[in-house]
Amino acid sequence: MDPILLGGIVALSTILVLFSGVSVALGLLIVSTGFLLIFDGLRSLELIPEILFGKLDNFALLAIPMFIIMGSSIASTRAGADLYEALERWLTRVPGGLVISNLGACALFSAMSGSSPATCAAIGKMGIPEMRKRGYPDGVAAGSIAAGGTLGILIPPSVTMIVYGIATETSIGRLFLAGVIPGLLLVGLFMAWSLYSTWKSGDQQLLSSRVYTWKEKFEILPRVLPFLAIIIGVLYAMYGGIATPSETAAVGALLCLLIAVIIYKLWNPKDLWVVLRDSTKESVMIMFIIAAAGVFSYMLSSLFITQAIAEWI
């Protein structure tokens, strides 16, 4: 069979399997195993366990569970609420201040967690109800969180960049560095548009009637400083050549857990167990996808689909 036609059948089969509700990793394994059985026979199946293990036998993968623990431990506390409240106090009289507060809190939380879903959940829990109370349209409230949540993919430490770096054998440190300027640029553009659109509409009811004193503005800053220190410390350790991304992730995870326990009183073993359990589930899910993608890639190469597409292009 023509490899290009076979590639189209593989792509269609993958889409159908994934749309059937099967998990991504299992879907990739089903498609890969099926096509290998049909075209290569039973002998090819002997290599699947070796490929699965080989894809996971990578020191760089240690960064994934560590950064996920960072995000889970922070998301289980009031850290997101504190970030949001601090920005809201300083920007309360600025047109579109709540939207800007949402975006700023999302950017900072993304730099701590590296996860878009965790960012949306932590900041949206506080931001959306407050914006509704102030009179913002639901679309603006949800849109600010959705836009800010996407920053978790760009702003380091990004779990998505780690997975991409491992899959393409690209330097994770360089990927992180490449995401800093685009991430900050997006934050700035989002904030500038929010300020302009609110100012142009002239809707004064969106401004808070409460005016915070300088004392109230400064007294909340100590709650935010530990997280800023972690962000700066993690980035400095990576780009200063002090530690690798995996080693930095381990230190960051430990510091975030200590902050969650000491500052936010996360003493209850059940709460800590929930953090570790959720982190483990998410880590295993991502690792399984990476391993299954390795088998899928082997199948494409074994059936000469990759080579045929490269020549055709």
Stretches with model-predicted labels:
Residues 1-313:
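Alpha-helical transmembrane segments of multi-pass membrane transport proteins
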